[in-house]
């Protein structure tokens, strides 16, 4: 092989090698650029999610503050309406896990609505509790003394014709009221207090028919029932207040 041919033989592989290295280098650079673009896109998606969350939180708090009545039912309507259109984390390109902001958004998304769903639940309980507490208060506010007045009873007529029918009607109405979760023991106390009074009034009527004296007190039963109702109402109100405080301090993680 001549000198020129040998030189060409060595130069050609070198040129090919250089070309291959150049192509590989270009591919690596392109991959890095594509990866950088995907991460940047994921950052934008994550940031947009947190921005939507902040807007959602601000809107809920603003709309709740505009509810003049302060009634649990009205507050619940606001929360439930907002929960129908919650912030949603958009899908991201491959490699999004390399984005710190997107990873944080993925972690936060499952818990973002927790304070609001909890508030909705607490408000729903408060709505039920309000009707129950009112029914219990009405029953306990219309005892025998309210219906009959103070004094000595000599005739069973008013007891049988007015007091007992009214007490039995009140008991039936109370028993027809839905008992919210967590209020069963309260309902038992109220029911028991009224049942006790009905039994005592019936016994008093029998004694009046026989010309015998009879007296009874129902303060212990009624006071215990009233306290149970107050404690239950306080607990429900406290749960709502706590849930409201939680959303006021809610921050995406």
Predicted regions mapped to residue ranges:
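N-terminal export and membrane-targeting signals
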Residues: 1-17
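Intracellular, membrane-proximal regulatory regions of polytopic membrane proteins
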Residues: 72-114
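Extended alpha-helical scaffolds
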Residues: 27-34, 55-62, 66-82, 86
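Generic alpha-helix initiation/capping and coil-helix boundary signal
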Residues: 15-20, 35, 39, 180, ...
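C-terminal amphipathic alpha-helix
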Residues: 46-67, 98-253
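Feature targets compositionally biased, intrinsically disordered low-complexity regions
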Residues: 2-3, 24, 69, 94, ...
């Amino acid at each position: 092989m001549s000198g020129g041919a040998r030189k060409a033989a060595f130069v050609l592989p070198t040129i090919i090698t250089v070309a291959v290295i150049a192509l590989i280098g270009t591919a690596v650079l392109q991959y890095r650029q594509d990866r950088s673009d995907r991460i940047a896109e994921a950052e934008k998606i994550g940031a947009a999610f947190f921005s939507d969350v902040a807007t959602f939180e601000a809107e809920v708090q603003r709309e709740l503050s505009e509810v003049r009545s302060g009634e649990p039912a009205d507050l619940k309507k606001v929360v439930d309406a907002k929960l129908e259109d919650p912030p949603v984390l958009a899908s991201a390109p491959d490699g999004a896990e390399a984005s710190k902001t997107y990873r944080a958004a993925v972690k936060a998304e499952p818990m973002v609505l927790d304070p609001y769903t909890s508030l909705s639940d607490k408000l729903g309980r408060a709505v039920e509790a309000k009707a129950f507490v009112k029914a219990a208060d009405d029953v306990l506010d219309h005892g025998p003394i309210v219906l009959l007045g103070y004094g000595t009873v000599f005739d069973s007529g008013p007891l049988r014709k007015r007091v007992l029918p009214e007490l039995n009607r009140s008991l039936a109405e109370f028993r027809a009221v839905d008992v919210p979760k967590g209020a069963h023991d309260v309902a038992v106390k109220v029911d028991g207090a009224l049942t006790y009074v009905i039994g005592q009034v019936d016994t008093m009527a029998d004694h009046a028919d026989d010309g015998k004296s009879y007296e009874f007190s129902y303060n212990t039963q009624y006071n215990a029932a009233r306290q149970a109702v107050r404690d239950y109402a306080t607990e429900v109100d406290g749960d709502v207040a706590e849930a409201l405080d939680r959303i006021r301090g809610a921050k995406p993680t």
